[in-house]
Structures are given as C-alpha cells and as structure tokens.
Amino acid sequence: MSHACGANQALRLHHGTLNAVLLPTVLDFNRDYIGEKYRRLNAAMGQETDADPAEFFRDLNLKIGMPQNLGEMGITRGMISSLATHAAKDSCTSTNPRHCSTEEFKELFETAIGV
C-alpha cells in the first residue's frame, strides 16, 4: 500500500511515513490471521500480550506527530481505485499473511484515508 501511495510523484510522500500511517490499518486487517505473532510483538514492546498492537501504533504516531491518516498526506478518495489496483499488483503483497483482493485494498485505503 505504501508503494502505491508513493508512486504518486506529485505528492512526494516519504515511504517510512506512509508505512507508519498505514501500519495500524494493516495490523487490524491481519489480526485474525497472525494472533501468535501479535502476542510476541506485544511482548517485545513491553505491552500486555493481549493488547491491540494497532492501537499502540496509533497512539505512538499521535505522540510523535505523524499524520493520523492518508487524507492528511494528500491522498483522496478519488485515488482509491488506482491505488488498490497498484497495491494488488505489487509483488510485496505476496508476503502479507492474509491475501488481499483489489476490493479489500479499496476498503483498506478508504479506512486509511480517514474522515
């Protein structure tokens, strides 16, 4: 998803910032597919093992002044279809623990854009 957003050269978006902003949305999407890894992640971060890692990263992003959603970075709803198509074709998508269809990418981008 970060690659899809970063491909828009006019916006000049930083890849690491995109990763940070998208991380909570992707963690929510994958939650039911990698529960044990989430418990290990929480333990490594000093959190309760049943804590919500997506919420942890939302809070962290807020504390360090990161954008809270893609909308704050200039991504609009009108871009969703092309972003989803790009993300679905990205070879990095194959490493995600949960398969994501183009339609699911559209939903994820909708969520990540925010209000």
PLM regions with names:
Residues 6-79, 115:
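Gly/Pro-rich interdomain helix-loop hinge
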Residues 77-115:
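Short, amphipathic C-terminal "tail helix"
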Residues 1:
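Oxyanion-binding "anion nests"
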